[in-house]
Amino acid sequence: MTVLHSVDFFPSGNASVAIEPRLPQADFPEHHHDFHEIVIVEHGTGIHVFNGQPYTITGGTVCFVRAHDRHLYEHTDNLCLTNVLYRSPDRFQFLAGLNQLLPQELDGQYPSHWRVNHSVLQQVRQLVAQMEQQEGENDLPSTASREILFMQLLLLLRKSSLQENLENSASRLNLLLAWLEDHFADEVNWDAVADQFSLSLRTLHRQLKQQTGLTPQRYLNRLRLMKARHLLRHSEASVTDIAYRCGFSDSNHFSTLFRREFNWSPRDIRQGRDGFLQ
Protein backbone atom coordinates (compact mmCIF):
# COMPACT_ATOMS: atom_id res chain seq x y z
CA MET A 1 0.00 0.00 0.00
CA THR A 2 1.24 3.49 -0.86
CA VAL A 3 2.34 5.66 2.08
CA LEU A 4 2.36 9.45 1.63
CA HIS A 5 5.01 11.25 3.69
CA SER A 6 4.77 14.68 5.29
CA VAL A 7 8.18 15.72 3.94
CA ASP A 8 6.67 15.74 0.44
CA PHE A 9 3.74 18.00 1.33
CA PHE A 10 4.60 20.36 4.20
CA PRO A 11 6.56 23.49 3.20
CA SER A 12 9.05 23.09 6.06
CA GLY A 13 9.88 20.79 8.92
CA ASN A 14 8.33 23.26 11.36
CA ALA A 15 5.06 23.78 9.49
CA SER A 16 2.08 22.35 11.37
CA VAL A 17 -0.46 22.89 8.54
CA ALA A 18 -0.29 22.55 4.74
CA ILE A 19 -2.84 23.03 1.96
CA GLU A 20 -2.94 20.54 -0.90
CA PRO A 21 -5.55 21.22 -3.64
CA ARG A 22 -6.71 18.45 -5.95
CA LEU A 23 -8.49 20.18 -8.83
CA PRO A 24 -9.57 17.68 -9.97
CA GLN A 25 -8.92 14.55 -7.94
CA ALA A 26 -8.59 11.54 -10.23
CA ASP A 27 -9.11 7.96 -9.10
CA PHE A 28 -6.34 7.19 -6.60
CA PRO A 29 -5.40 3.78 -5.12
CA GLU A 30 -5.59 2.87 -1.46
CA HIS A 31 -3.03 4.68 0.68
CA HIS A 32 -2.38 6.14 4.09
CA HIS A 33 -0.15 8.93 5.45
CA ASP A 34 2.20 9.80 8.27
CA PHE A 35 0.03 12.90 8.86
CA HIS A 36 -3.68 13.71 9.31
CA GLU A 37 -5.90 15.54 6.84
CA ILE A 38 -9.29 17.20 6.47
CA VAL A 39 -10.66 16.59 2.98
CA ILE A 40 -13.05 19.30 1.78
CA VAL A 41 -15.09 18.38 -1.30
CA GLU A 42 -15.58 21.53 -3.39
CA HIS A 43 -17.78 19.99 -6.08
CA GLY A 44 -18.20 16.94 -8.28
CA THR A 45 -18.86 13.40 -7.12
CA GLY A 46 -16.96 10.24 -6.36
CA ILE A 47 -16.64 7.25 -4.09
CA HIS A 48 -14.42 7.53 -1.04
CA VAL A 49 -13.55 4.06 0.29
CA PHE A 50 -12.53 4.72 3.88
CA ASN A 51 -11.12 1.81 5.90
CA GLY A 52 -12.87 -0.55 3.50
CA GLN A 53 -16.28 1.18 3.57
CA PRO A 54 -17.54 3.11 0.51
CA TYR A 55 -19.06 6.59 0.91
CA THR A 56 -20.57 8.70 -1.86
CA ILE A 57 -19.02 12.18 -1.66
CA THR A 58 -20.30 15.39 -3.25
CA GLY A 59 -19.80 19.12 -2.81
CA GLY A 60 -20.03 19.94 0.91
CA THR A 61 -18.71 16.59 2.15
CA VAL A 62 -15.94 16.93 4.73
CA CYS A 63 -13.80 13.88 5.59
CA PHE A 64 -11.54 13.62 8.63
CA VAL A 65 -8.67 11.24 7.88
CA ARG A 66 -6.27 10.12 10.61
CA ALA A 67 -2.72 8.98 9.95
CA HIS A 68 -3.57 5.29 10.39
CA ASP A 69 -6.72 5.38 8.23
CA ARG A 70 -6.48 3.86 4.75
CA HIS A 71 -8.55 5.29 1.94
CA LEU A 72 -8.92 5.58 -1.82
CA TYR A 73 -10.94 7.49 -4.43
CA GLU A 74 -12.74 5.84 -7.32
CA HIS A 75 -15.44 6.53 -9.91
CA THR A 76 -14.66 10.26 -9.69
CA ASP A 77 -16.59 12.72 -11.84
CA ASN A 78 -15.11 16.24 -11.87
CA LEU A 79 -14.29 15.70 -8.19
CA CYS A 80 -12.44 18.73 -6.80
CA LEU A 81 -10.94 18.55 -3.31
CA THR A 82 -8.95 20.75 -0.99
CA ASN A 83 -6.90 18.81 1.56
CA VAL A 84 -5.96 20.58 4.78
CA LEU A 85 -3.02 18.60 6.15
CA TYR A 86 -1.81 18.68 9.74
CA ARG A 87 0.82 16.56 11.44
CA SER A 88 -1.16 15.58 14.53
CA PRO A 89 -3.66 17.18 16.95
CA ASP A 90 -0.83 17.55 19.50
CA ARG A 91 1.83 18.91 17.09
CA PHE A 92 0.74 22.56 17.06
CA GLN A 93 3.02 25.22 18.47
CA PHE A 94 0.37 27.60 19.79
CA LEU A 95 -2.73 25.40 20.17
CA ALA A 96 -3.69 22.70 22.68
CA GLY A 97 -6.78 20.55 23.12
CA LEU A 98 -7.67 20.46 19.41
CA ASN A 99 -8.61 16.80 19.63
CA GLN A 100 -11.82 17.82 21.41
CA LEU A 101 -13.02 19.56 18.23
CA LEU A 102 -12.33 16.57 15.98
CA PRO A 103 -14.61 13.55 15.43
CA GLN A 104 -14.25 10.99 18.22
CA GLU A 105 -14.30 7.23 17.80
CA LEU A 106 -16.87 5.60 20.10
CA ASP A 107 -17.42 1.85 20.42
CA GLY A 108 -15.46 1.28 17.23
CA GLN A 109 -17.51 3.80 15.24
CA TYR A 110 -15.68 6.82 13.82
CA PRO A 111 -17.89 9.59 12.30
CA SER A 112 -15.38 10.40 9.57
CA HIS A 113 -17.73 12.05 7.05
CA TRP A 114 -19.59 15.29 7.80
CA ARG A 115 -21.53 17.60 5.52
CA VAL A 116 -21.83 21.39 5.36
CA ASN A 117 -24.08 23.55 3.21
CA HIS A 118 -23.02 25.84 0.38
CA SER A 119 -22.79 29.04 2.43
CA VAL A 120 -20.54 27.34 4.99
CA LEU A 121 -18.43 25.90 2.18
CA GLN A 122 -17.82 29.47 0.99
CA GLN A 123 -16.61 30.44 4.47
CA VAL A 124 -14.38 27.36 4.55
CA ARG A 125 -12.82 28.39 1.23
CA GLN A 126 -12.01 31.83 2.60
CA LEU A 127 -10.25 30.41 5.66
CA VAL A 128 -8.30 27.92 3.56
CA ALA A 129 -7.28 30.66 1.11
CA GLN A 130 -5.89 32.72 4.00
CA MET A 131 -3.90 29.74 5.26
CA GLU A 132 -2.58 29.08 1.77
CA GLN A 133 -1.45 32.70 1.33
CA GLN A 134 0.74 32.43 4.43
CA GLU A 135 2.38 29.08 3.62
CA GLY A 136 5.67 30.66 2.56
CA GLU A 137 6.11 32.53 5.86
CA ASN A 138 7.92 30.72 8.69
CA ASP A 139 8.21 33.46 11.32
CA LEU A 140 6.38 33.05 14.63
CA PRO A 141 3.55 35.53 13.90
CA SER A 142 2.76 33.78 10.59
CA THR A 143 2.85 30.35 12.25
CA ALA A 144 0.51 31.57 14.98
CA SER A 145 -1.81 33.11 12.39
CA ARG A 146 -2.04 29.86 10.40
CA GLU A 147 -2.77 27.87 13.53
CA ILE A 148 -5.49 30.34 14.57
CA LEU A 149 -7.06 30.01 11.12
CA PHE A 150 -6.95 26.22 11.49
CA MET A 151 -8.75 26.53 14.84
CA GLN A 152 -11.37 28.76 13.20
CA LEU A 153 -11.82 26.15 10.47
CA LEU A 154 -12.44 23.40 13.02
CA LEU A 155 -14.91 25.56 14.95
CA LEU A 156 -16.78 26.44 11.76
CA LEU A 157 -17.01 22.82 10.65
CA ARG A 158 -18.12 21.62 14.07
CA LYS A 159 -20.80 24.28 14.47
CA SER A 160 -22.06 23.88 10.92
CA SER A 161 -21.99 20.10 10.55
CA LEU A 162 -25.11 18.03 10.21
CA GLN A 163 -25.09 17.09 13.85
CA GLU A 164 -25.71 20.67 14.97
CA ASN A 165 -27.40 22.62 12.17
CA LEU A 166 -30.79 21.79 10.68
CA GLU A 167 -32.23 25.27 10.39
CA ASN A 168 -32.42 25.54 6.58
CA SER A 169 -33.33 23.38 3.61
CA ALA A 170 -29.73 22.96 2.47
CA SER A 171 -28.79 21.49 5.84
CA ARG A 172 -31.85 19.23 5.82
CA LEU A 173 -30.90 17.99 2.36
CA ASN A 174 -27.43 17.15 3.68
CA LEU A 175 -29.06 15.17 6.49
CA LEU A 176 -31.19 13.37 3.90
CA LEU A 177 -28.07 12.40 1.92
CA ALA A 178 -26.47 11.04 5.06
CA TRP A 179 -29.68 9.11 5.80
CA LEU A 180 -29.58 7.55 2.33
CA GLU A 181 -26.05 6.26 3.02
CA ASP A 182 -27.53 4.14 5.83
CA HIS A 183 -30.91 3.31 4.23
CA PHE A 184 -30.01 2.85 0.56
CA ALA A 185 -31.38 -0.71 0.55
CA ASP A 186 -34.80 0.33 1.87
CA GLU A 187 -37.78 0.93 -0.37
CA VAL A 188 -37.73 4.72 -0.71
CA ASN A 189 -40.92 6.74 -1.13
CA TRP A 190 -39.71 10.20 -2.08
CA ASP A 191 -42.89 11.93 -0.87
CA ALA A 192 -42.45 10.35 2.56
CA VAL A 193 -38.73 11.12 2.62
CA ALA A 194 -39.39 14.76 1.72
CA ASP A 195 -41.87 14.99 4.60
CA GLN A 196 -39.44 13.26 6.97
CA PHE A 197 -36.83 15.95 6.35
CA SER A 198 -39.28 18.87 6.18
CA LEU A 199 -38.68 19.52 2.49
CA SER A 200 -41.16 19.95 -0.31
CA LEU A 201 -40.75 17.32 -3.02
CA ARG A 202 -39.96 20.07 -5.52
CA THR A 203 -37.23 21.51 -3.27
CA LEU A 204 -35.78 18.04 -2.71
CA HIS A 205 -35.55 17.41 -6.47
CA ARG A 206 -34.12 20.84 -7.25
CA GLN A 207 -31.49 20.96 -4.51
CA LEU A 208 -30.36 17.37 -4.90
CA LYS A 209 -29.95 17.90 -8.65
CA GLN A 210 -27.97 21.11 -7.99
CA GLN A 211 -25.70 19.40 -5.46
CA THR A 212 -25.11 16.05 -7.17
CA GLY A 213 -26.08 16.59 -10.81
CA LEU A 214 -28.54 13.69 -10.49
CA THR A 215 -32.26 13.27 -9.91
CA PRO A 216 -33.17 11.69 -6.54
CA GLN A 217 -33.90 8.25 -8.02
CA ARG A 218 -30.81 8.35 -10.22
CA TYR A 219 -28.71 9.28 -7.18
CA LEU A 220 -30.23 6.43 -5.15
CA ASN A 221 -29.67 3.91 -7.95
CA ARG A 222 -26.06 5.02 -8.31
CA LEU A 223 -25.53 4.78 -4.55
CA ARG A 224 -26.97 1.24 -4.55
CA LEU A 225 -24.78 0.24 -7.49
CA MET A 226 -21.67 1.64 -5.78
CA LYS A 227 -22.44 -0.38 -2.64
CA ALA A 228 -23.07 -3.47 -4.77
CA ARG A 229 -19.76 -3.06 -6.60
CA HIS A 230 -17.96 -2.86 -3.25
CA LEU A 231 -19.62 -6.10 -2.09
CA LEU A 232 -18.78 -7.84 -5.36
CA ARG A 233 -15.13 -7.00 -4.79
CA HIS A 234 -14.93 -7.66 -1.07
CA SER A 235 -17.46 -10.40 -0.21
CA GLU A 236 -18.29 -13.94 -1.28
CA ALA A 237 -22.06 -13.32 -1.55
CA SER A 238 -23.75 -14.27 -4.81
CA VAL A 239 -24.68 -11.65 -7.39
CA THR A 240 -28.38 -12.28 -6.67
CA ASP A 241 -27.91 -11.91 -2.92
CA ILE A 242 -25.92 -8.70 -3.37
CA ALA A 243 -28.62 -7.28 -5.64
CA TYR A 244 -31.27 -7.87 -2.97
CA ARG A 245 -29.02 -6.57 -0.18
CA CYS A 246 -28.54 -3.34 -2.12
CA GLY A 247 -32.22 -2.64 -2.74
CA PHE A 248 -32.85 -4.32 -6.11
CA SER A 249 -35.79 -6.73 -6.25
CA ASP A 250 -34.85 -8.09 -9.69
CA SER A 251 -31.30 -9.36 -10.23
CA ASN A 252 -31.63 -9.14 -14.03
CA HIS A 253 -32.63 -5.48 -13.80
CA PHE A 254 -29.73 -4.97 -11.38
CA SER A 255 -27.27 -6.48 -13.87
CA THR A 256 -28.59 -4.27 -16.67
CA LEU A 257 -28.23 -1.08 -14.58
CA PHE A 258 -24.83 -2.21 -13.33
CA ARG A 259 -23.42 -2.69 -16.82
CA ARG A 260 -24.88 0.64 -17.93
CA GLU A 261 -23.22 2.43 -14.99
CA PHE A 262 -19.76 0.80 -15.03
CA ASN A 263 -19.42 -0.76 -18.51
CA TRP A 264 -18.70 -4.05 -16.76
CA SER A 265 -21.07 -6.82 -15.69
CA PRO A 266 -21.33 -7.86 -12.02
CA ARG A 267 -19.54 -11.11 -12.96
CA ASP A 268 -16.70 -9.11 -14.56
CA ILE A 269 -16.22 -7.14 -11.34
CA ARG A 270 -16.36 -10.30 -9.22
CA GLN A 271 -13.58 -11.82 -11.35
CA GLY A 272 -11.47 -8.65 -11.27
CA ARG A 273 -11.60 -8.09 -15.03
CA ASP A 274 -11.81 -4.32 -14.55
CA GLY A 275 -8.25 -4.43 -13.20
CA PHE A 276 -9.14 -3.45 -9.63
CA LEU A 277 -7.99 -6.76 -8.14
CA GLN A 278 -4.87 -7.12 -10.25
UniProtKB/Swiss-Prot annotation:
Keywords: Activator, Cytoplasm, DNA-binding, Repeat, Rhamnose metabolism, Transcription, Transcription regulation. Its main location: cytoplasm. SMART domains: HTH_ARAC. Binds DNA as a dimer. Residues 191-212, 239-262 bind DNA. Residues 174-272 form the HTH araC/xylS-type domain. The record marks D241, D250 as: Interaction with sigma-70. GO terms for biological process: positive regulation of DNA-templated transcription; rhamnose metabolic process. SUPFAM superfamilies: Homeodomain-like (SSF46689), Regulatory protein AraC (SSF51215). One of its GO terms (cellular component) is cytoplasm. It holds the Pfam family AraC_binding. Activates expression of the rhaBAD and rhaT operons. One of its GO terms (molecular function) is DNA-binding transcription factor activity. This is HTH-type transcriptional activator RhaS. It comes from the Bacteria. NCBIfam families: PRK13503.1. Signal peptide: none annotated. It is found in: Cytoplasm. PANTHER family: HTH-TYPE TRANSCRIPTIONAL ACTIVATOR RHAS, HTH-TYPE TRANSCRIPTIONAL ACTIVATOR RHAS-RELATED.
